[in-house]
Amino acid sequence: MSLDLRIEQQQKSLWCWVAVSVSVKRFYTTATIHQCEQASSQNDGKPCCDDPDACNVKDGYLMAALQRLGVFRQLVEDSVPFELLAAEIAQKRPVCCRIEWRDRTGHFVCIDGYDGRALFVKDPWDGAFLRVPYDEFKTRYRGSGRWTHTYLTTP
């Protein structure tokens, strides 16, 4: 089962949170929100559309970004059971996840479907659609990523 969420590729190296939040909003509505506009809203109104490099900061918070766009429902500070993911997808709600790399930096992705126990992961880093076994996604996403937080969304 797949929701066919179209993930935007992040326009700056640290804008995974921007691309994920904008992609989820676009999944639920026809609203057009540019990544630089969303980045500006989280950077004290800096003109990110005029100078995106000045806004390429790592303190972007996905929860606040989803809240600002009206599509945030709940934060779980951990991974969640496969059955919860399946239930969210069945309700046509993509699930966002924070991945932590070995160097303790983070990255955000979206899950928009599954087949058996394999998850359909949309990654804004390169716009990739990846089919990743659930157990691998929890502890070894792209080799070394560990799933640390789950963001449930709502229309």
Indicate where each model-derived feature is located.
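N-terminal carbohydrate-binding/catalytic regions of secreted carbohydrate-active enzymes
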Residues: 20, 24, 28
